[in-house]
Curated annotation (Swiss-Prot):
Native organism taxonomy: Eukaryota, Fungi, Dikarya, Ascomycota, Taphrinomycotina
Subunit structure: Homodimer. Forms an autoinhibited tetramer consisting of 2 homodimers that self-interact, wherein the membrane-interacting BAR surfaces are sequestered and the PX lipid-binding sites are occluded. Interacts with Vps1.
Name of the gene: mvp1
Gene source species: Schizosaccharomyces pombe (strain 972 / ATCC 24843)
Keywords recorded for this protein, A-Z: Cytoplasm, Endosome, Membrane, Protein transport, Transport
Location(s), subcellular: Cytoplasm; Endosome membrane
Binding site for a 1,2-diacyl-sn-glycero-3-phospho-(1D-myo-inositol-3-phosphate): R320, S322, K346
Protein name (record): Sorting nexin mvp1
Any one GO molecular-function label of the UniProt entry: phosphatidylinositol binding
Tree of life domain: Eukaryota
Biased composition (Polar residues): 224-236
Keyword Ribonucleoprotein annotated: no
Domain PX residues, every copy: 279-398
PROSITE patterns for this protein: PX (PS50195)
Amino acid sequence: MGDNVFLEPDPWASSSNWGSPVKPLNYKTAIGNSSIPLQYRNYWDVFQANNVLLFPEEESYSDIFHVPQDVMKEFFTLIESSSNQPLRQIQFFVLLALVACYQLGVPSTLEQIFKQRNVLPILQRFNPELFNRSSDNETPLFPNNSPPASTTALNLSSNIVPSINESKILEQEDDDVSNKSLPHAQQSIIRSFPDIQKQPKGFFSYPSSTVSSIAPSTLEAGNLHSQQPPKFSVDSSVDDNAITPRKPFSKIPNRLSPSTQPLLSNSRHSSFRLASSSTSFPASLEMNVDIDLEPSGYFFYRHNNYIISDSSNTREVLRRYSDFFWLHSYLMKKYPFRRVPLIPLKKFHFAKRNASTQNSFLEHRRQELSDFVNDLSHHPIFSNDEVVRVFFTEPNVFKNWRRENQKRIDQEIEQFLVVPQSQVPDASETVKERLLKLNMSTTTAINNQLNIFRIFEKMIFTLQHFHEDFLRLQNSFNCLLDSGLYHQVFTSTFAQNESKIMSMASGHFYNIDSLLHQQNDAVKHTFLLGLSKEIKILISLRLLIERISEVFSTDLTKVRHTISNDENLLRETANSDESGRNRTFLNRSSKKRAENSLKSKKELYLKNLNQRYQIAHELEQELSYLQDYVFSLGNPYVEYCKQHVKLEEESLKIWHTLESDFSRLET
């Protein structure tokens, strides 16, 4: 989670011609820790070579980037530039990012950018090494009535998405320039600035062949993340394909079309066919869940959404808590004999207008949802489920998608759960014994893990009290030093010696307090988080055992005996009718009821027998998957011990340093 820099509304936004921007609290925060694109650094070298261009002149920059002067004036205000001093490097980078976002057209205001990714910085929204996949079905970035601009305008929006060579990006009208080195090409940009300044102002325009019409659904709030920057060129010699708009969700399922995705009814493991070609979900990627601090909805329906992205930032979707809850219910219904990860319980939460990452409820739910999605993404079966893949990749509102496809999803679940009418071996004895051992071991492990968790929570509480004590110690030492007591009462030599001792002790306790802070963070963020993940995994395993135990509550021996008795009764009745005897075992209505009862008992027996056989197979798979996942998480005890040993070694060094300082004073 980054710092939210767009919480302060801009009082002059109403008089702005650039929509309703929101002024960042600090432009330095806007740059954050994100990686600066290589092209931005190249432009910095180019502009630095010409000292005149580094001065924030609205007219010059407006002509270079084809941005209105009033907008450029707002940009200079945002980066806190001065007209009589050249731009610093960080100011220049932020300016390029703002210009790039403006050239994108959608979104067109900082407020909309904030809604897309409230944990800005702006540059962090776009990774220069990733969004390289093209898409022909992209909405236009600018209205059709935008004034045409020269193709020689320096467009920075694709600097965030460099998908062609730098030599081609910096290509001039002369064909031989593209074969030259990058610094020489950069110098050619400087030479082309006078020509650029003569061009008429306006937006950067795209050929009509590369831009499709705007669909109303693409402008919904849930689809804000699908708008991505295009490629660009500073010269008209670059072909039109170089400026095809791109987005991070280019090769993912958009929605399930009933006309193009028939169900595979002959297969038990049938799945949806996607309307567009979709890549397999990367199960090895770490998933991140962030809180969207901008609430959605009105009045009592106001809520906070959650931003799901993978570690490579190639995908980013917006989901509500109800979407997570629906997905959990879907998995429980479709995979009753597999370990479904835990999800935080439903609880009413009124989203405040200005949410904060310090909200304990939101942070606790975010952490649990993060564990949920990571457990899903590492599960070989769940990660390949089509509904799960759509959940992680569908950029539109997931609630609308699942409503449109609810009937087809229900049919898919019914076909998946159809029990084959075939005899399978009885796996009751082996599974029962395994379940008994698993139930005892998981219950014992959960109880012990919870006890350890509580003990370390008490340790954190104790460390916080130590921190308060050390603060009081430092204040006492500082008061002694500031009062000048030793210099007023005792001789100068003795007073200087005592003052040095007090200063050393104060510095020593400050260092110890810093180590306690590190130890506190190590317990909180390393050990307790890892331990809580293991506890939730064990609880989900125990819930799986409880669901499986319900299947074994049916006594198949009694069912077999009743089936045998009913068959004998019907056989005797049939023989009596054939022999023409006066006595009949069953009349016609009773015989019909007996036949129906026998049929239902046989179906129950076959279903239970197949379920036990399925459990025996899937239980071994789940334990194998669980072992691999826990191994990938790492042992929290080992990580904590490593950090604790490191901190203890640093603490020992501090004590040795203090001892050597005291020994030097005595000598």
